[in-house]
A protein has these predicted regions:
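Catalytic nucleophile-loop/oxyanion-hole region of alpha/beta-hydrolase
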Residues: 110-120, 131-167, 298-305
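Mobile cap/lid helix-loop segments that gate and shape the active-site cleft of serine hydrolases
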Residues: 64-70, 202-238
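Short beta-strand element of the alpha/beta-hydrolase
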Residues: 96-104
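Short beta-strand/loop motif that positions the catalytic acidic residue
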Residues: 242, 248-250, 254
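N-terminal cap/lid segment of alpha/beta-hydrolase-fold proteins
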Residues: 25-93
Length: 323
């Protein structure tokens, strides 16, 4: 019941925001299934058990966050701890792809509408099953977001046959893009390795303060991390020939996360002969995600459909080839 109340509360906030702005009423897509990643909370080292079989691992570190989540009118969620969960969205016409979706928010919040519900709305229209992760915020416990994403992969792999899934990729935005890139380079095994990656205006480099997004670096690693730790969590330094094929999208003039972050990851992929593509749009800035008119100003404006076409083509290329 608690997880249902959380989802309904976010939807109500979205509706209220639309009414206050005198915009057409927007009813956000609701998940078909919401699953707590740690049903017994972070204090118990246990994951999800179904039919007597454990299909995910436990929480590992406890991020120390207690009490209810805090959700603002834009659907940005803070204070995620025991309530870490996945929202599953099933398309009407599934094409065999699934995406583990990582909303951004500087590792301080999770952007559950713009980069969660709205993303799922478009992706399911393309036939993609979506597993959007409301991951634990690190609170200076750096391992917890990646642990949650890897458990989301384990959950989806366990249900792949049931859902008709042949490939599971990862997608992320800003700090969520950093998380998606980290999942693409620091995976634990074949189960947690993404089959493909989609990075939208991602934070990549954590080594250089003039390049990185300082809030993301601080939120994940703290104020004075070691050089080895910074290198480990700078995904461009962890790329190998086994890193998944990657789609990168960003705006040329991003004053929040400098575009050089994307360039560095793209160059690392090329250096290791990993298939990759990068799309740079002349407007949009940062954080445009999947917000769209008339419900919210669209930063991409006339390039929205260009982005959709580019991403749809990449996803189409991920479909199993007919023999």
């Amino acid at each position: 019941m608690k997880k249902i109340i959380i989802a309904l509360g976010i939807a109500a906030l979205c509706l209220a925001a639309c009414k206050q702005a005198k915009q057409p009423e927007y009813v956000p897509l609701q998940p078909d299934l919401t699953v707590l990643l740690y049903p017994q909370g972070q204090a118990v080292d246990a994951g999800i058990v179904e039919n007597g079989q454990q299909i995910t691992l436990g929480p590992g570190e406890d991020n120390g966050l207690r009490g209810p989540e805090v959700v603002n009118p834009n659907g940005n969620i803070a204070n995620i701890g025991d309530s870490a969960r996945v929202d599953i969205y099933f398309p009407k016409n599934p094409n065999g792809l699934c995406i583990v979706n990582c909303p951004g928010g500087g590792y301080q919040i999770v952007s559950s509408i713009n980069e969660g519900m709205c993303a799922a709305e478009w992706l399911t229209s393309q036939g993609v099953t979506v597993c959007s992760v409301n991951y634990r915020l690190p609170n200076f416990h750096r391992t917890v977001p990646l642990t949650d994403v890897q458990n989301a992969f384990r959950y989806c792999r366990a249900h792949a046959q049931e859902w008709g899934i042949s490939k599971i990729g990862v997608m992320g935005y800003s700090a969520g893009g950093h998380l998606a890139a980290t999942a693409s380079t620091l995976y634990a095994d074949d189960i947690t390795r993404p089959d493909f990656s989609v990075l939208i205006y991602p934070v990549i480099d954590l080594t250089t303060l003039s390049i990185t997004h300082v809030g993301t670096r601080h939120g994940l690693l703290g104020e004075i991390p070691s050089e080895d730790l910074v290198d480990l969590y700078s995904p461009q330094k962890q790329v190998t020939p086994e890193t998944p094929e990657t789609f990168i999208a960003l705006s040329a003039y991003d004053n929040v996360v400098p575009p050089v972050n994307s360039f560095m990851y793209f160059q690392a992929l090329q250096a290791h002969n990993v298939p990759c593509q990068m799309h740079i749009y002349p407007i949009g800035g940062h954080g445009w995600g999947f917000y769209h008119e008339p419900y919210h100003p669209d930063g991409l404006q006339q390039y929205r459909e260009v982005f959709y076409t580019d991403l749809a083509r990449f996803l189409q290329d991920q479909l199993p080839k007919a023999e």
